């Protein structure tokens, strides 16, 4: 029987709060092209402001203890990137493509992530706050102590992802895909859950009463139940 890791939980059985990124007291201003993303490169203790890092194709880059403000990563492709103890604010990740990448102790806020493809990735101690993530894909990725807060995730794809360590607060998940996802202990609070796909995979998740009402029609459809008006 394959080993299945347990979600990060606190003493009361609730998902633990993500650890805040550990940034140094001062950061060095990044300068391009010297501090650009490159294969097997290391970005350490740097601050990128209004930089254009779009349309890059990079493998095995390491980003540690960095801050990114209003940086453009649109259409960049990352393979086996390691990103830790870093903060992203107001960045554009539209149509970013990644594979086998890792986020550890990372905060992303007020960023555009429409169409992001984060496949077979690892996310641990991560917060997404106020991000636009329509049609983002996290297929086959693993989430441990990850919080989505106030995010727009309409038609996002979590197919076969391990979401047992994830929490969704005040998120729009209209039409999101959860087929074959692992969701024991996944929490939803004040979320829009209309038209979910793979709704039977929510077995074991924790949902507020108000959110549960939105699942009635999706569950009925999945079970072949017809709901008639009185």
Residue ranges and their predicted role:
Residues 2-230:
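Tandem repeat scaffolds
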């Amino acid at each position: 029987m394959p080993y299945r890791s347990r979600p990060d939980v606190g003493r009361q059985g609730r998902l633990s709060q993500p650890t805040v990124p550990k940034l140094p007291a001062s950061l060095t201003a990044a300068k391009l092209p010297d501090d650009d993303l490159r294969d097997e490169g290391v970005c350490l203790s740097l601050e990128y402001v209004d930089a254009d890092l779009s349309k890059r194709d990079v493998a095995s880059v390491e980003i540690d203890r960095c801050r990114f403000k209003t940086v453009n990563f649109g259409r960049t492709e990352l393979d086996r990137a390691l990103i830790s103890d870093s903060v992203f604010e107001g960045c554009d990740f539209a149509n970013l493509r990644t594979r086998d990448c890792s986020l550890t102790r990372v905060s992303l806020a007020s960023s555009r992530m429409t169409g992001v493809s984060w496949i077979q990735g690892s996310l641990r101690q991560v917060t997404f706050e106020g991000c636009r993530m329509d049609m983002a894909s996290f297929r086959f990725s693993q989430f441990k102590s990850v919080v989505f807060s106030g995010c727009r995730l309409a038609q996002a794809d979590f197919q076969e992802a391990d979401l047992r360590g994830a929490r969704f607060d005040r998120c729009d998940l209209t039409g999101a895909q959860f087929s074959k996802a692992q969701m024991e202990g996944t929490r939803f609070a004040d979320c829009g859950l209309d038209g979910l796909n793979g709704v039977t995979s929510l077995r074991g998740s924790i949902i507020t009463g108000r959110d549960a009402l939105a699942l009635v029609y999706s569950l009925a459809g999945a079970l072949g139940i017809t709901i008639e008006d009185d």
